[in-house]
Amino acid sequence: MCPVENKWLKVGQKGAGPGARSSHAMTVVGNKVYCFGGELKPTIHIDNDLYVFDLETQEWSIAPATGEAPFPCFGVSMVTIGSTIYVYGGRDDKRRYNGLHSYDTETNEWKLLAPVEEGLPGRSYHSMAGDDRKVYVFGGVTAKGRVNTLHAYDVVDQKWVEYPAAGEACKGRGAPGLVVVEGRIWVLFGFDGNELGDIHCFDLASEQWKAVETTGDVPAARSVFPAVSYGKYIVIYGGEEEPHELMHMGAGKMSGEVYQLDTETLVWERIVCGNEEEKPSQRGWCAFTKAVKDGEEGLLVHGGNSPTNERLDDLVFWGFSHLNVN
């Protein structure tokens, strides 16, 4: 297929930011990026500060906070609905798991919405996505192993909703891509002891699962990678294509490629993102979110683990304006 050209932008950073880390999470409220959790060394948590990056001034700060914050953790996920951030899961170095917390960006208050004892089994390296009412949680690693369950937290009714199980065809997995597109939840790839290359889709209206076969420039199996939606398209970047023999303690084979999937035609296309010297380091285990930078919507990525097992501290942006869309 004919590759589409686009380029990465390295975003300048000022102020006291999160620094080098991996297994953390990011989300956006307005022109502010919020970052939480992570590890600098494998399986050792860092802090529970909530870092804020202003996309206009390009400066980091630490959010003022009251209330009951999540404890320091890694393998955590977060999404935004309205002006509220929802943070779920993640574990510390003693394998304690966080429940579901919210952070109100207008009042700067943390709240514990659902402790682990009253909600889902504690987990890390799960994936989250959201719409205007629900926070969706799929998969992850619990104390009993990797799971393939799908739940949602209804922010209006303030309760968990359990959906039908994904079935044996969709193995329990950690760190898949999870994206909501036009009333359907897409589960892409992940890790079950091996990197997975399958895709599954859940229709929210019919509550039916189905396995999805795709064509085109199909990406290699992978996990711990950014995945976001853009209209009817899913965009993925990077990830770990092969695990290290030491698993989490080492860095496996990392990717630096960008792909787009048309969810109607089910055709993948690999995107050429400038010259090799213009690309950011290959990585996985990074924080990511959709964001608008200088009027353009795109993928914003912070940190992650590099092929040398060194944690990264850069902030890079990839705009959607040159995607091959129709």
UniProtKB/Swiss-Prot annotation:
It is an enzyme of class 4 (lyase). The proton donor differs depending on substrates. Does not contain the mannose-binding lectin domain present in other members of the family. GO terms for cellular component: cytosol; plastid. It holds the Pfam family Kelch_KLHDC2_KLHL20_DRC7. GO terms for biological process: glucosinolate catabolic process; nitrile biosynthetic process. It catalyses: a (Z)-N-(sulfonatooxy)alkanimidothioate = a nitrile + sulfur + sulfate; (Z)-phenyl-N-(sulfonatooxy)methanimidothioate = phenylacetonitrile + sulfur + sulfate; (Z)-N-(sulfonatooxy)prop-2-enimidothioate = but-3-enenitrile + sulfur + sulfate; (Z)-(indol-3-yl)-N-(sulfonatooxy)methanimidothioate = (indol-3-yl)acetonitrile + sulfur + sulfate. Mainly expressed in seedlings, and, to a lower extent, in roots and leaves, but barely in seeds. A (Z)-N-(sulfonatooxy)alkanimidothioate binds at R91, S124, R146, A175, V224, W285. It comes from Arabidopsis thaliana (Mouse-ear cress). The active site is at R91, R146. Disruption phenotype: No visible phenotype. Kelch repeats lie at residues 32-83, 84-130, 134-183, 185-232, 234-290, 298-326. InterPro entries: Kelch-typ_b-propeller (IPR015915). Its EC number is 4.8.1.5. Fe(2+) binds at E240, H248. It comes from the Eukaryota. Keywords: Iron, Kelch repeat, Lyase, Metal-binding, Repeat. GO terms for molecular function: lyase activity; metal ion binding. This is Thiohydroximate-O-sulfate sulfur/sulfate-lyase (nitrile-forming) NSP5. Its cofactor is Fe(2+). The presence of Fe(2+) supports lyase activity in a dose-dependent manner with both benzylglucosinolate and 2-propenylglucosinolate as substrates. More active at pH 7.4 than at pH 6.
